[in-house]
């Protein structure tokens, strides 16, 4: 079986599980989001092992688990974010000499990713649509950028970070993201206006930046993949880097234009 076939099969299986848990929502999706965050933190600490200490690992795991418990107990977004930021601050101060900002960055990256995904879904009727909108934008970006880049080639997007990504792939991915976002948004709101396409474009751009940033992190530690958990895709970070970056932006957008704990109203503020 070729790497592309393995990649496609893994994507189909993961996509099916993800969409089912998104439909279920509630605690099920929250646990799924926390599992993603925990996997991200594991891979981050393994990648940056030379910047970690026994304390940073133990403290990071404990703080991330408690953050997840706060999410499950639904203690409020601001409290959970505040708790997460406090933990990152402690790591930054206590581990700066040995690890610089790597331990704190890993905790925030994993924790805020889990929090963003969980709160975007929430328990509201349109939480499902909100997450599907995010998936449509990011997956359209990933799939189209991959195949468009391979078919058209052309100038490299950021060869210092990721030698295989091209401008043709990035532009094609962004265009597909706008189309995918418009399709999903049309299910819950009347067509028209500039809000949805602009948001979809921004999410696509941030998704691709998140992908490049994760590639940069791997290069800092001489790694090709973040892990081996996902056949054909490498690690969890390799698969969700763009998704969690876009989720963070969409969460912030919803928190500003709706409210931190109930984000589905984002579709009615354009």
From Swiss-Prot:
Its main location: membrane. It holds the Pfam family CTP_transf_1. Keywords: Cell inner membrane, Cell membrane, Lipid biosynthesis, Lipid metabolism, Membrane, Nucleotidyltransferase, Phospholipid biosynthesis, Phospholipid metabolism, Transferase, Transmembrane, Transmembrane helix. The chain crosses the membrane at residues 19-39, 53-73, 76-96, 101-121, 126-146, 183-203, 248-268. It catalyses: a 1,2-diacyl-sn-glycero-3-phosphate + CTP + H(+) = a CDP-1,2-diacyl-sn-glycerol + diphosphate. GO terms for molecular function: phosphatidate cytidylyltransferase activity. Its EC number is 2.7.7.41. It comes from the Bacteria. PROSITE patterns: CDS. GO terms for biological process: CDP-diacylglycerol biosynthetic process. Pathway: Phospholipid metabolism; CDP-diacylglycerol biosynthesis; CDP-diacylglycerol from sn-glycerol 3-phosphate: step 3/3. It is found in: Cell inner membrane. GO terms for cellular component: plasma membrane. It is a multi-pass membrane protein. Belongs to the CDS family. This is Phosphatidate cytidylyltransferase. It comes from Brucella abortus (strain 2308). The gene is cdsA.
